[in-house]
Amino acid sequence: SLGEIVNELSRYDCDRIIFTGGEPALQDLVALSACLKPLGYYLSIETNGTIPIPTGTIDWICVSPKDQEYKNLKIKQRIGNELKVVYLGQELSMYDELKDGFEHLFLQPLYDEGQNTEWNGMSFHSTFEKVRNNPEWRLSLQTHKWMGVE
């Protein structure tokens, strides 16, 4: 319940909440926002973009499309604060229509725990080179994965 969520949050000294994992836009964001924003929480979301985020419910929207894994997905959340793309060798021109709705563009190398250091290093290198040659994009790393921190 919303009351249980507020009780749990009150145990922590924080004022920013990030909704992520699975697809958080499947939850009732309007009710969550109406409950949490008056308490002073800044709300962020990382979404695959297939479900539009109701205007005014979330303070920071990160769209991270899963279009390389699921080719038939349609991105419906076309505006936000950041567009974060996992780089698998795709042409960045495929995001030309989408990227104008975002303030920040991030390209992230795929880190695969099932692969060896050399493979992951090549993934990083190819992403780094892509960013170097496309300066409107910035490099984003999931540092905890590279460090082996769970």
Please report, for each region that a protein language model flagged, where it lies by residue.
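Auxiliary Fe-S-binding modules of radical SAM enzymes
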Residues: R11-C14, Q90-E150
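Structural preference for beta-strand elements that scaffold enzyme active sites
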Residues: R16-I18, Y42-S44, W60-C62, G80-K84, ...
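Conserved Radical SAM active-site core
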Residues: S1-I58
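Anionic group-transfer/hydrolysis microenvironments
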Residues: G22-A25, N48-T50, K66, L110, ...
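Short, polar loop motifs at secondary-structure junctions
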Residues: E46-I53, P65-E69, Y87-E91
